[in-house]
Swiss-Prot record:
CDD domains: MH1_SMAD_1_5_9, MH2_SMAD_1_5_9. This is Mothers against decapentaplegic homolog 5. The gene is SMAD5. The keyword Transcription applies. One of its GO terms (biological process) is BMP signaling pathway. The keyword Transcription applies. Zn(2+) binds at C65, C110, C122, H127. May form trimers with the co-SMAD SMAD4. Residues 198-214 have a biased composition (Low complexity). It comes from Gallus gallus (Chicken). It comes from the Eukaryota. InterPro entries: Dwarfin, MAD_homology1_Dwarfin-type, MAD_homology_MH1, SMAD-like_dom_sf, SMAD_dom_Dwarfin-type, SMAD_FHA_dom_sf, SMAD_MH1_sf. Gene3D superfamilies: 2.60.200.10, SMAD MH1 domain. Residues 13-137 form the MH1 domain. Belongs to the dwarfin/SMAD family.
Length: 465
């Protein structure tokens, strides 16, 4: 009690009352400063303090929006850290382990949600809900493969992979993503698989740092470069979280449950591993991500933070001047989030990052090997578990090789500073000075279990073509 008393000795009664509803016991001083800053803003608005106290004291009861003015870059500075206001106060009063704005979705009753770009933003923590990971339906593996595969979207997507161009295509975010995309392959009218949601692109999201992130970045992180249209953000979120309409009945209408073996998805201990390369040389050990929010940067971190993969620590005797110069420009690097069954890459570096993700390319209707440029301050969804689950559910009916082909979708390559592909003089990722390879463990382990259940391929996979 003595320590608590000394903590609140110079705290106003209003701040004391609001801190009474604080969740968790970490960062007491920071929470006090965050609440104090909020009280100063709310005192200027009649009834705002009362409405906030009502919401905090009666969580199950309806409450009104509690708003503060939106800053120029949408963020709020508390102490030496910047973050998005709704994330800060949801973290104080509801979820102390909240990592990112990607984990929050506004309720329908909220009139001033953060994503609506209005002059005021609602910070009522009970006007937001936490995005939950969708429950993926098990893949039903036929015990006896008598399925006659038709020309479906999956087959045509795979055929494109087999006829890969000498150099990958390039796309720049958000420019290449804003025009209505036409799928580069035609869809058979009899295909049981739906078209990729190419027109439903996921827009950039504001750079989040400070309280909404465990990394305590300085206050001068890049401001958001692009904000999504209101309806676009809402549509994408609601679509990606809808698990009610699974693909099983459509894919296997005439197969009884006795003829199939269900294989369920399980979350692994480490959701991904990251390997760092310089040109075609692997450097250092693989980083295994246990936290759902990981920073890969160019600095050194003597504290061995499990949420950070610091490339500045890694040495390579074969390093040339181009690599050295590129490493100096990695800076704050990339922030990887795994939220609600989706993986996002957020560019915190002053230089762009370049991503090759077959899952992302499928979603946007790009060629499978397309390399997407993500400028500083932008973030892009680079993997969606639900879309992968749908592709896997269909591919089991096309045989072992079709499922095995999906392993390529579970590896994402990302280059710092320097791009590669048709628009760059570097043709391959192994020609870029500094790049990482991200292996998604959950999807890979799911594939492994499905392949084990399927048995041997009809045409054994070998190195001989």
């Amino acid at each position: 009690m003595t320590s608590m008393a000394s903590l609140f000795s110079f705290t106003s009664p209003a701040v004391k009352r609001l801190l009474g509803w604080k969740q968790g016991d970490e960062e007491e001083k920071w929470a006090e400063k965050a609440v104090d800053a909020l009280v100063k803003k709310l005192k200027k608005k009649k009834g705002a303090m009362e409405e906030l106290e009502k919401a905090l004291s009666s969580p199950g009861q309806p409450s009104k929006c509690v708003t503060i003015p939106r800053s120029l870059d949408g963020r709020l500075q508390v102490s030496h850290r910047k973050g998005l206001p709704h994330v800060i106060y949801c973290r104080v009063w509801r979820w102390p382990d909240l990592q990112s704005h990607h984990e929050l979705k506004p309720l329908d009753i909220c009139e001033f949600p953060f994503g609506s770009k209005q002059k005021e933003v609602c910070i009522n923590p009970y006007h937001y809900k936490r995005v939950e990971s969708p429950v993926l339906p098990p893949v039903l593996v036929p015990r006896h493969s008598e399925f006659n595969p038709q020309h479906s979207l999956l087959v045509q997507f795979r055929n494109l992979s087999h006829n890969e161009p000498h150099m990958p295509h390039n796309a720049t975010f958000p420019d290449s993503f804003q025009q209505p995309n036409s799928t580069p392959f035609s869809i058979s009218p009899n295909s049981p698989y739906p078209p990729s949601p190419a027109s439903s692109t996921y827009p950039s999201s504001p750079a989040s740092s400070g309280p909404s992130s465990p990394f305590q970045l300085p206050a001068d992180t890049p401001p958001p470069a692009y904000m999504p249209p209101d309806d676009q953000m809402g549509q994408d979120n609601s679509q990606s979280m809808d698990t009610s309409n699974t693909m099983i009945p459509q894919i296997m209408p005439n197969i009884s449950t006795r003829d199939v073996q269900p294989v369920a998805y399980e979350e692994p201990k480490h959701w991904c591993s990251i390997v760092y390369y310089e040109l075609n040389n692997r450097v250092g050990e693989a980083f295994h991500a246990s936290s759902t929010s990981v920073l890969v940067d160019g600095f050194t971190d003597p504290s061995n933070n499990k949420n950070r993969f610091c490339l500045g620590l890694l040495s390579n005797v074969n390093r040339n001047s181009t690599i050295e110069n590129t490493r100096r420009h990695i800076g704050k690097g990339v922030h990887l989030y795994y939220v609600g069954g989706e993986v996002y890459a957020e560019c915190l570096s002053d230089s762009s990052i370049f991503v090759q993700s077959r899952n992302c390319n499928y979603h946007h209707g790009f060629h499978p090997t397309t390399v997407c440029k993500i400028p500083s301050g932008c973030s892009l969804k680079i993997f969606n578990n639900q879309e992968f689950a749908q592709l896997l559910a269909q591919s089991v009916n096309h045989g072992f090789e079709a499922v095995y082909e999906l392993t390529k979708m579970c590896t994402i390559r990302m280059s710092f500073v320097k791009g590669w592909g048709a628009e760059y003089h570097r043709q391959d990722v192994t020609s870029t000075p500094c790049w990482i390879e991200i292996h998604l463990h959950g999807p890979l382990q799911w594939l492994d279990k499905v392949l084990t259940q399927m048995g041997s391929p009809l045409n054994p996979i070998s190195s001989v073509s």
